[in-house]
Every structure is written in structure tokens, then in C-alpha cells.
Amino acid sequence: MKKFNKDIGTYCEKLSCDYLIEHNFKILECNFKNFLGEIDIICIKNSILIIIEVKGRYNYEFGLPKESVSISKQKNIIKVTKSYINYKKLYNFNVRFDVIEIYLNKLNSSYKINHIKDAFRT
């Protein structure tokens, strides 16, 4: 099950990157990892550094995708973001935290993207 979830996560992240590029976001990182954790996508648009958590679902059995971005997950994303900003010296950017929800059908042949801007704050 873990490999299946990882494959779905990778697929959803690729769909998200394609969506963001199509909407004129500049992708800086996909799957950025350090000793603190991971950020799915880091990008820039209109001089804003945007940190994106990607969540995909086949159904609502476990709730909406955005609901799985818990307070503790948000705090971890914020910690990793601060570390990334220091590492890359990106001090002159405002930062926004978004969530991209992807709703998949059972065959992965169609999907719907919901981009939630400013989904949470520091």
C-alpha cells in the first residue's frame, strides 16, 4: 500500500507542476527534502515565494484532501520553508502557503484540480 500511495503522490505532484507551469508559475523545486522534512513544490509567481502541499484523493472516505494538512503538518512545512529560505538566501520574498487538491477517478484517466491559495499562514 505504501508504494501505491507514493506512486499516486508522485502522479499528483506531476499533475500539479504541469498545472502551475500552465498558469505561469516558475517552479524552483519539486520534492525538496532536508533533515527537517519535505516540501512538495516550491515556486514563484508575481514575486511571491509559494510553498505548495499536494494532496490527491479517489473519494471522500477520509475527508477532503486539504483536511489532511493538519496543524502539525503545517508547522513542519513552515519549519522546512524557513530552512529553505535561509539555505537559498531568499529573504526578499513574501511567502504564501497553498494546497493543491487533486480528485482522481478510479482509472486515473481524468482528474480535477482545486488550487487553494493562502491555505494556511505562519
From Swiss-Prot:
InterPro entries (UniProt xref) = Restrct_endonuc-II-like (IPR011335), tRNA_endonuc-like_dom_sf (IPR011856), UPF0102_YraN-like (IPR003509)
Entry similarity comment: Belongs to the UPF0102 family.
Gene Ontology MF annotations: nucleic acid binding
Q: Name its species.
A: Clostridium botulinum (strain Eklund 17B / Type B)
Upper classification of the source organism reads: Bacteria, Bacillati, Bacillota, Clostridia, Eubacteriales
Mind telling me which SUPFAM superfamilies this protein's record contains? Answer: Restriction endonuclease-like (SSF52980)
- Pfam families given for it? UPF0102 (PF02021)
**Stated name of the protein:** UPF0102 protein CLL_A1253
In terms of Gene3D superfamilies, this protein maps to: 3.40.1350.10
